[in-house]
Amino acid sequence: MSIAAAPLTLALSKGRIFEETLPLLAEAGIGVVESPESSRKLILPTSDPGLRLIIVRASDVPTYVQYGAADFGIAGKDVLIEHAAGQAGRLYQPIDLNIAKCRLSVAVREDFDYAAAVHQGARLRVATKYVQSAREHFASKGVYVDLIKLYGSMELAPLVGLADAIVDLVSTGGTLRANGLREVETIMPISSRLIVNQASLKTRGASLQPLLDAFQRASQGQADSNS
């Protein structure tokens, strides 16, 4: 009697990345049976019995892939940079999927003269979830900062005097404007990447590679449509 192989596991987070991954899965002929928004389940089947999804926090996707609890996953460049800090090895990132695009930016209150503060060599307090990216950015510019790690409601920090500036993801800038903030620098463009457990690629490559190829085709289509 043959024993069926366990399904491949794809780690995803709820929200924009999940929604923008659906067309990529469709490119491979795979449909999602249940939505994480309407289901309490954290392990979701797909129309392909050889693939299941696990729904985790965005910041946890690289950890699940690194330790083999997921064969592959999709995570933002911002998350991957923070995950790589303090990690001995690097995750295999074969494909930029060109989804969930935004930018990592510095923002301040409308009435704060950021350029003057930087020019005068002031030591700035900066609130962010993206400590590694912020540290590298300000160090490269020779700006002295004290970094304050927050996990949410970043826009509040300058308004109540906790920080002079924030480093956060920006899409349209609407949330910044609604809270009386403005962008002053773009640190880097952000998009989501496909990441793969290297052991899975070696041991389950025959099953995994067709999916990777389908993601590659779909991501190229995304890039072509945006060019």
UniProtKB/Swiss-Prot annotation:
Q: Which PANTHER family match?
A: ATP PHOSPHORIBOSYLTRANSFERASE (PTHR21403:SF8), ATP PHOSPHORIBOSYLTRANSFERASE ATP-PRTASE (PTHR21403)
Q: How does it assemble?
A: Heteromultimer composed of HisG and HisZ subunits.
| Source organism of the structure | Bordetella avium (strain 197N)
**UniProt main location, coarse:** cytoplasm
Q: What does this protein do?
A: Catalyzes the condensation of ATP and 5-phosphoribose 1-diphosphate to form N'-(5'-phosphoribosyl)-ATP (PR-ATP). Has a crucial role in the pathway because the rate of histidine biosynthesis seems to be controlled primarily by regulation of HisG enzymatic activity.
Name the pathway: Amino-acid biosynthesis; L-histidine biosynthesis; L-histidine from 5-phospho-alpha-D-ribose 1-diphosphate: step 1/9
Pfam families under this entry?
A: HisG (PF01634)
Name of the protein in question: ATP phosphoribosyltransferase
Against PROSITE patterns, the record matches this protein to:
ATP_P_PHORIBOSYLTR
Catalytic activity of the protein? 1-(5-phospho-beta-D-ribosyl)-ATP + diphosphate = 5-phospho-alpha-D-ribose 1-diphosphate + ATP
Which GO molecular function terms does the record list? Answer: ATP binding; ATP phosphoribosyltransferase activity
The entry's family comment says:
Belongs to the ATP phosphoribosyltransferase family. Short subfamily.
Q: Where in the cell is it found?
A: Cytoplasm
